Structures are given as structure tokens and as C-alpha cells.
Amino acid sequence: MLDLFKAIGLGLVVLLPLANPLTTVALFLGLAGNMNGAERNRQSLMASVYVFAIMMVAYYAGQLVMDTFGISIPGLRIAGGLIVAFIGFRMLFPQQKAIDSPEAKSKSEELEDEPSANIAFVPLAMPSTAGPGTIAMIISSASTVRQSSTFADWVLMVAPPLIFFLVAVILWGSLRSSGAIMRLVGKGGIEAISRLMGFLLVCMGVQFIINGILEIIKTNH
């Protein structure tokens, strides 16, 4: 049981900086301004369900996609590292705030004409939460843990769905309490936390690239 908690904790530490619910909260506040409370709650729930589904598909079907297109693990790690590092750089040095982006503005204009517009899948679930960096991380991690003997087989079966479920629950809770979060930490606080997460993502991306290169060198020797 202790191994299960360790695996879940490790998974959350890896995924949460990539999923970054706080940036999704900032985007949600910009897009859902014209929605009533019930509609905001519905969008929050649907976004969380979509995120869970995307992560499950990436974990269990990602290897099949890799085999179909002939993608190697080192190649995936290097590509995932580049994506993660790029996302981290954008979070460290943002050009536009999420709520001021053209996508958010156009979505806000839609909401003025159609208050019940669906923003749960795009952009809240994808690409804001379960974006390319998150998906690459999940596929790479799935391939790694299946080859590793660190955890028992039953832990590797039970932990991933629980990790994805907890990420979805954290996102749902964050979106449900989006107004309170913004009032508590303020825009400056969210920006500071986002930049810290961006730095962590850059470090993780560089480590991904290093691991991929080392694996290529080891394979060719």
C-alpha cells in the first residue's frame, strides 16, 4: 500500500506542473464571465471529465500509436522534452496573458451571443490542461514504468487511473473555486506561481532530452 501512495505522489509531482490548473483557472475566468453559476459548474465538471479521458487514452493507447508510426522511446523523450521545455519557456517569459489572448477574446465574443457555448474541451481540457507536453509525458512515462521493476505489477495497474482521477478532481475543484482563488492570490500571485512552474518544466524538459540522448548512445554501443 505504501508503494501505491509513493507512485501516486510521484505521478502528481510530475503531472501537476504540466497540467498547471492555475493557468486553466485564469483562462476560465476570462472565458466564463457571462455564464451563470450552474453553467460554470457544468463546464468545470465536463472539462475535468475530458482531461481524465484524454490522459487515460494517452496512457493505454499511446504505445500502440508509437508502434504504428515507428516512434522510438528515445525519440519520444527528446520530442517530449523539447515540447515541455518550450511550454516552460513560454510560461517563464509570457508574451500575452491567457485571458488577453486572441483565442480568449474570440471565445468571449462567442459567449456574449451564446452564453451556453462549450469551452470545456477546447480550450480548457485541451490544450490548456492536457496539452501536447502532458500527453508526451504520459506516453513516455507509460513506456518507462512498464519496463521498470521499481513498483509491483498491481501498483502499476491501479496507480495510473487514480493519478489521472486526482488530477481531474484537482482541476474540477480549482475551476469551481476559481473566483475565490483569484481573490486570494491575485493576478500577480497566479503569474508568480505560473513562472515557477515554468522553470520546473524547463528543467524537466532538459532532463528528458538528456535521458533520450543517453539512451541513444547506450543503444548504439
Curated annotation (Swiss-Prot):
- Its main localization is membrane
Q: Would you say which domain of life the source belongs to?
A: Bacteria
- Answer whether the UniProt record assigns the keyword Transmembrane helix to this protein: yes
For this UniProt record, give its keywords in alphabetical order, as a comma-separated list: Cell inner membrane, Cell membrane, Membrane, Transmembrane, Transmembrane helix
- Output the Gene Ontology cellular-component terms: plasma membrane
User: Which residue spans traverse the membrane?
Assistant: 8-28, 45-65, 69-89, 119-139, 155-175, 197-217
Periplasmic compartment residues = 1-7, 66-68, 140-154, 218-221
Please list the residue ranges that the record places on the Cytoplasmic side of the membrane. 29-44, 90-118, 176-196
**Topologically, how does it sit relative to the membrane?**
Multi-pass membrane protein
Q: Which family does it belong to?
A: Belongs to the UPF0056 (MarC) family.
Q: What is this protein called?
A: UPF0056 inner membrane protein MarC
Per the UniProt record, the lineage of the source organism begins with: Bacteria, Pseudomonadati, Pseudomonadota, Gammaproteobacteria, Enterobacterales
Q: Which gene does this sequence derive from?
A: marC
